[in-house]
């Protein structure tokens, strides 16, 4: 996370299209070519010519860089989601204490509960056009319009890896935020909660479902339950 656009330009080659993504209201992580001589540690994405950069999008993140408390805060911070690999993002203090011991020194809590998990979106550029790698915060569940003669409602459960569910009504396809790999009970629960939330939010009852043909996949079970 860079404190501002100038910091991002110091670390990466920021094209006009990349700048529009970085400063847009969606505020995704943008993969860009790193500059030689930047201040980012070589241990950040080692042996990779690209790094993902995001600008602050929440008040707390702005305060990390600008709060006048006498402490000098670097203008570039390593940022990651509050979860272990293969697990959903922690949503409660108890989940943080259970899942992240040894990974963080301090926990900032609040009396306002987190109701919905959502990852940062990840975008790169191909010929100066946005290319979505992970469609989540800022983009989901905004619909994608698909040309064709489509009628009815469908729930698509996605695969076991890098999972996302989709609820379609006629030509509008509503993708959920990124869920992740479905391989444990908690991730399966998160997938189910996400599908129910999408259904209730859009007031769409699926008439049929689409899933991987493997009967043991949790995504297949989700469609059967729906």
Locate the predicted segments by residue.
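Active-site-adjacent structural elements in enzyme catalytic cores
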Residues: 1-226
């Amino acid at each position: 996370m860079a404190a501002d656009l100038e910091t991002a330009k110091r670390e990466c080659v920021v094209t006009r299209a990349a700048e529009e993504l970085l400063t847009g209201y969606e505020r995704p992580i943008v993969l860009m070519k790193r500059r030689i001589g930047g201040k980012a540690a070589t241990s950040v994405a080692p042996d990779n010519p690209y790094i993902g950069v995001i600008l602050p999008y929440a008040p707390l993140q702005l305060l990390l860089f600008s709060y006048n408390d006498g402490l000098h805060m670097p203008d570039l911070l390593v940022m990651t989601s509050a979860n272990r690999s293969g697990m959903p993002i922690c949503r409660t203090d108890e989940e943080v204490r259970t899942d992240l011991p040894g990974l963080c020194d301090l926990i900032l809590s609040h009396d306002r509960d987190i109701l919905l998990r959502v990852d940062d979106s990840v975008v790169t550029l191909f010929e100066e056009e946005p290319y979505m790698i992970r469609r989540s915060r800022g983009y989901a569940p905004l619909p994608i319009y698909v040309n064709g003669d489509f009628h009815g409602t469908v729930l698509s459960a996605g695969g076991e890896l890098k999972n996302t569910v989709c609820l379609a009504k006629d030509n509008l396809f509503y993708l959920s935020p990124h869920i992740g790999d479905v391989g444990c009970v908690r991730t399966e629960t998160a997938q189910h909660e996400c599908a129910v939330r999408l259904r209730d939010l859009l007031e769409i009852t699926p008439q049929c479902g689409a899933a991987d043909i493997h009967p043991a996949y949790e995504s297949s079970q989700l469609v059967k339950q729906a």
